[in-house]
Amino acid sequence: MFDAALRGLIDKVKSGSMDRRAFVQRMICIGITPPMATQILAIGGVATAAPPSTYKPTKCGGGGPLKMLWWQGPTLLNPHLATSMKDQDGSRLFYEPLACWDPDGNLQPVLAAEIPSIQNGGLAPDGKSATWKLKPGVKWHDGKPFTADDVVFNWEYAKDPDTAAATTATYRSTTVERIDDLTVRILFSKPTPFWADAFVGAPGAIIPKHLFADYRGNKSLKASNNLSPVGTGPYKFIEFKPGELVRGEINPQYHMTGRPYFDTIEMKGGGDAVSAARAVIQTGEYDFGSNIQVEDDVLLRIEKGSKGKSIRVAGADVEFIALNFTDPNTEADQERSKTKHPLLSDPAVRKAIALLVDRETIKKAIYGRAGNTTANFLNGPEQFVSKNTSWEFSIEKAAKLLDDAGWKPGSDGVREKDGRKFKLLFQSSTNGARQKTQAIIKHACQKAAIDVELKSVVASAFFSSDVANPDTYTRFNADIELLASLSTQPDPERRMRTFHSRYIPSEESKWQGFNIPRYASRDYDAVIDAAEVEIDPVKRAALFVKANDILWQDTVLIPVIHRMRVAACSNTLRPVISSWTTDIDNLHDWYREV
């Protein structure tokens, strides 16, 4: 699994002649990030070291209310059916995974008693299994015990194709077996370099078997508990108004000592990012605002308020434009993925549109401190970032590409070919920064004689997990759309397998696939399949770089801005935010310090 030099370094850490920090620094020098270095140590038999806790409260409760703003409000509270981070966040208020990611990218146990390692017998040396020990005494909010049966059920539920779970990719090639009431073993079909995927982080949160057993498969959307969660988390469910409000109260039987700190919790939806920032930083009406995607000059003015501040976390989030490879207005055999887009199926047309995205203006006019221009979909960790790509803004070159492809300006000034006008429907969620970005791109397209119609959809609807909603980003009833890909773990496998052909959304899959461009490439599929089983970390990183480069070469999408994650926080709140996962994956450690 490891070459001699790497094995020698791991042995030094085991013996105590090299500390963990020195090992991580050596890994950084060869392009391996701290989170991945930690994973290498775990595979090599070195147990995960728990960092010192920064949590100061000494008793459970007494912290009063925690009021949060998610202007993209949750619309569903089942982590397996959540197609967007807002629904993962709403679910994570109540449901928990076996482990979560801390700000440094280290795994921390939640429902697990410990993190698996070779040293504690949890990881197989051949990389083909991981054994989790569960915490004893954990109870669901209705008093039923949490056991290994619940963990096994979540695997069965998610891998069932009729369930159409958004998490199916994580569980489809694994087997989960019950060893005893408090032990489960995950078996991988092949050596698995990144084993900490299943049951980890917000997407790995676990639902109760006794409430969902009758709703596995094609009944998954009929479960009433999709809207009224019964979890194991620090807060118990009180109320849910989809898109508007989620409320919870303290769980006095919570399994972590001295936690939680707050007595009640509220996640308010609606409004926009600007009003959310103001409500935290200027008026102090709320304690925390997530995803503050606000023009930087606006945020600078808001930051003059005295009640709070903005916080920025660097990660791998990217704002990008997806290009539809299928015709949103046509179906073949009731399946859109079998159609070809009349304009965007031509690589020259896709490359021309990419040339019309003025990233530098978008950065300067909108993102400022919160983003940098990029040509890469994969922008971190560093060893996975391609140096082979570049971007350019040129209306002249775009026009020539279109001319050569047969798209000539007509009498009305709009390009046409074979009687078809070059017109694009460009959609995104309702947000000031995104509407400005759309306008900048439309202006350039008009100069290239392309007619662009802009559409904005209320964020709670655009990112909804409601399969009946025709305006979701996964339905993609437009030609191009602007959105973001946000990190949920340090490893890029989950993000990059998004564009594998097996994950194309369809009516059959209840629109749960994340391959929203409907891109199908045997070359790309082969690279991802190889990366999923490559143990050598350097070779594996090279495969993900290659996958990124294929997306760039084929212009499957147009990366625009490598975004920082920005939130608004009251001066007294002490949140624990990690760029490797969702904002509230460490909610149990939040408290207030007056």
Say what each PLM segment does.
Residues 70-120:
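Protein kinase glycine-rich loop
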Residues 560:
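Active-site-proximal polar cores
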Residues 23-48:
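N-terminal export signals
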Residues 216, 370-389, 566-569:
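Mature extracytoplasmic/periplasmic domains
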Residues 167-216, 239:
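Surface-exposed binding/hinge segments that line
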Residues 2-18, 22, 26, 50-61, ...:
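Extracytoplasmic/periplasmic ligand-capture domains
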Residues 67, 108, 129-131, 183-185, ...:
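General beta-strand recognition
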